[in-house]
């Protein structure tokens, strides 16, 4: 039933029961039953055409997430400060279902177009904020990602073979940061470092971004100490706050 919610996005915010049934390969009668339950729970709302949009309960859940998500609560003040100090746009991201999802965005006037906003997902195999998370995945998770996205991994230059990918990611781990140039197709350059919980498991990343044609591109490349320090401070804050749930990286299955 909850898989129906996966259909709703910025690009496709309104769905009819028939459209959802076709998309999810469900009998229309079952789809109507699921929609009734989701509507009663406030997760979906009906609009004038009889179609459905995301409901008000989602706003309640988002408020809860902003209050208790460790990356958001600990990382938000630091990512704002980092953007102000460097005058670059900044992002906090988490691993979520074979993608990287932005949980906090701070934009500067010269922000590259198409930079991720809160709740927006990007492929796990493109861009500094994604690659620096990929580098710290356990071997069994990384192997699954490689098998499912081998062509994309090769396209962005991470490696055509399994051993090549492992060498590339080992280099990222040795440095503790990642720089990318235009991998997400947005014309953006990014610099990112990983975030960890108290057990050393990767939770997400903090990143800075600018346009590839920015006159300040070399300044971005020189901010490795700053991005690593910010990541370390956030990771330490997560580990030190026992009232927050610092679970391992979101489901990768």
Task: List each language-model region with its residue ranges.
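Juxtadomain coupling helices with adjacent low-complexity linkers
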Residues: 162, 168-170, 175, 179, ...
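Short, basic/aromatic recognition patches
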Residues: 74-82, 146-192, 237
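N-terminal helix-turn-helix
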Residues: 2-68, 72, 232, 236-240
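An N-terminal domain-start capping segment
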Residues: 1-15, 80-102, 110, 229-253
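Sensor-regulatory modules in signal-transduction proteins
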Residues: 195-198
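Amphipathic alpha-helical effector-binding/dimerization core
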Residues: 50-149
């Amino acid at each position: 039933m909850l898989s129906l919610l996966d259909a709703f996005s910025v690009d496709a915010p309104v769905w009819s029961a028939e459209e959802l049934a076709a998309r999810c390969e469900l009998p229309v009668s079952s789809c109507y039953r699921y929609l009734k339950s989701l509507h009663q729970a406030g997760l979906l709302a009906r609009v004038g055409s009889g179609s459905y949009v995301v409901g008000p309960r989602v706003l309640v859940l988002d408020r809860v997430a902003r209050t208790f998500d460790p990356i958001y609560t600990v990382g938000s003040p630091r990512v704002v400060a980092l953007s102000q100090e460097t005058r670059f746009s900044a992002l906090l991201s988490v691993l979520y279902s074979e993608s990287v999802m932005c949980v906090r965005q701070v934009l500067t006037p010269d922000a590259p177009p198409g930079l991720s906003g809160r709740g927006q997902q990007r492929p796990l195999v493109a861009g500094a904020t994604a690659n620096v998370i990929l580098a710290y995945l356990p071997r069994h998770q990384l192997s699954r990602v490689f098998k499912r996205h081998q062509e994309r991994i090769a396209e962005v230059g991470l490696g055509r073979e399994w051993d090549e990918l492992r060498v590339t990611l080992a280099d990222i781990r040795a440095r503790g940061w990642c720089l990318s140039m235009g991998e997400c197709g947005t014309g953006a350059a990014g610099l990112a470092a990983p975030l960890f919980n108290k057990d050393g498991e990767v939770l997400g990343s903090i990143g800075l971004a600018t346009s590839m044609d920015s006159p300040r591109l070399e300044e971005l490349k020189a901010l490795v100490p700053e991005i690593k320090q910010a990541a370390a401070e956030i990771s330490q804050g997560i580990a030190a706050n026992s009232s927050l749930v610092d679970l391992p990286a979101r489901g990768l299955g």
